[in-house]
Amino acid sequence: SDLPAFVVMSTGSGISGGAANWASGFLPTTHTGVRFRNQGDPILNVASPTGVDARLQRDTLDLVRAMNEQQLGVVGDPEIATRISASEMAFRLQTSAPELMDLKQESRGTLDLYGCDPDKPSFARACLLARRMVERGVRFINIYHEGWDAHSDVTGNHTGNCKATDQASAALVKDLKRLGLLYSTLVIWGG
């Protein structure tokens, strides 16, 4: 696949606990989630530098891969295999990510269903991107919406959070069902 198996997004604010939330734990690091930004380039610096075309980049990547494979054969460190895999994924993302992130391809009806402004980061945008990722074979998608742990003004806090998440959450389930993807997708909503 041109996309990672495990993608993490947030609605723009920080994520309590940070990258430890999607780390691989006791599993090999190939199982670590890849954080996507909710707008623009999903991963910073994934584009080729100015003056580097796809052929030059492929040649460079092949050389680095050969050196990494040689080192992997010498030391047997599984982290080297992860590095090789990550480099290949980054190369593939350069072509697949722009199309994935372009929500202007969606119909006005779909954008309205989610309550999504395609130009602004939001929970709705993350849910619509999640649906597009499911269509493209991403197996695990984690969307964080911070701010639920209210210690004062609980009613105001939760009213705002519900307003930001309810429509898009329902739209995601409805849209997956409409596309015939809900029956092969497990949706968990938790806090």
Task: Label each PLM-derived region with a short phrase.
Residues 1-191:
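Ligand-binding pockets and gating/stacking loops
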